[in-house]
Amino acid sequence: MNYTILVTGPPYGTQNSSTAFLFCQSLLKTKHILHSVFFYCDGVLNANNMTTPAIDEFNLINAWQGLNKKHQVKLYVCNSAALRRGVIEDEKLLNMNVKKGNLALSFQLSGLIELAKSIKICDRIIQF
């Protein structure tokens, strides 16, 4: 089966993101196809490379990046939701008087059109 995952919870403070990540790992281990993960609402905070968990805590941002590198899973971040929450890529900084963006590597800003395309080609969408 083809899956798209929608993550609406932040990386820390709720279990939405960590549960989504564990579910994604399970999908891939059982040979399902994970087309993409779309981060929306507070879920866009998963793409903030300035998030620094304590040394003895699981680093969920690094885990998402590892999922992308190992399995080529697309990590889409809603552009509008990201801007509202202060997550921005370097290329968008020209007019904002900000020196460095904080969009983590492996994450890609996109619009809801990417979510719609993913939903269209997948068998299941699951929201966390």
Swiss-Prot record:
Key words, A-Z: Cytoplasm, Transferase, tRNA processing
One matching Pfam family: DsrE
Subcellular location: Cytoplasm
GO cellular component, one term: sulfurtransferase complex
EC number: 2.8.1.-
Top-level taxon: Bacteria
Subunit text: Heterohexamer, formed by a dimer of trimers. The hexameric TusBCD complex contains 2 copies each of TusB, TusC and TusD. The TusBCD complex interacts with TusE.
Role according to the record: Part of a sulfur-relay system required for 2-thiolation of 5-methylaminomethyl-2-thiouridine (mnm(5)s(2)U) at tRNA wobble positions. Accepts sulfur from TusA and transfers it in turn to TusE.
Similarity comment text for this entry: Belongs to the DsrE/TusD family.
Protein name: Sulfurtransferase TusD
